[in-house]
């Protein structure tokens, strides 16, 4: 399908969702008067605005806002306040982490106002069906992407049945409201099951501040990858930033992490194990070895924790998993020193079994 054809299909999908909402009396025409941020593509209430350098800005993003006074279509968000709270209660894991969940529920309980879902002053965008003077609000348009790729509105399509509802939307905390309030409200109104979970991750900070060109504190990931490699950067971010919270990073801490965890801890263990495998096992990890009680305890402990570790990953607690692995590697190096296998020249079997155990640890 050509890009122009795909674009036409997508427009029809967005317009179909619009018509479904309108058919159910969830969209009506009225007049909007209030603050709007072009850069945030978001509407703000009066209590979400402040004065900064003689300008009106959004408190959350510091982006400039302008007063808008124009005809607009509205989505009856207030109508879905009770349904949303019931949905959150029936699906307690829908919003994570807990701090974000509390934030969203508190906002909904404070009272939802109907949401402006069209702009009359914009020339670009998808036209409102049967009203070319209006274009559909960008977030109603953009959120439809999640289901348009699954051939919505055909809910019997194999892609739609296989992948919807989505297991998780992982999004930035600054757009949590769109995904955890507006999106499920749109879907419930259109009789579509919302995703199973929305996870609002934090920001990556540099020197305790949000990165910006004006502050000159941006760390270019492409340059870092050139210097240190992609996997070390991934590892550092996962370990350093507790998922769901803001995380402060620096090049110095990246280097310390690579040296301590990947080189001195993991790398050292790999080098030691490889040397023993080459020397005692013809460069192959042995398959059948008789372990001693201390070895069996270690392997049993690993096996018993696998389900918990998988659960932590499923719940986006990836840094917990990383911490567990780092601690096990540290213990493996300590066990290596305590056992002193290099002194067991006359105990070939013990040397080989020890090598087998350590090799399993590096693969784990």
PLM-predicted stretches and their roles:
Residues 6, 24, 140, 178, ...:
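Single, functionally critical "micro-switch" positions that shape active/binding sites
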Residues 12-13, 60-279, 321-327:
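Structured secondary-structure scaffolds
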Residues 270, 313-323, 332, 357-358, ...:
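C-terminal amphipathic alpha-helical
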Residues 328, 348-358, 363:
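An amphipathic alpha-helical micro-motif enriched in hydrophobic residues
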Residues 307-323, 339-354:
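Acidic, serine/threonine- and proline-rich low-complexity regulatory regions
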Residues 4-112, 152-159, 270-309, 329-347:
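Conserved, charged catalytic cores of large soluble enzymes
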Residues 246-251, 304-310:
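Short, charged/polar, low-complexity loop and linker segments
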Residues 1-6, 10, 356-364:
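Single conserved hydrophobic/aromatic residue that forms the stacking wall/gate
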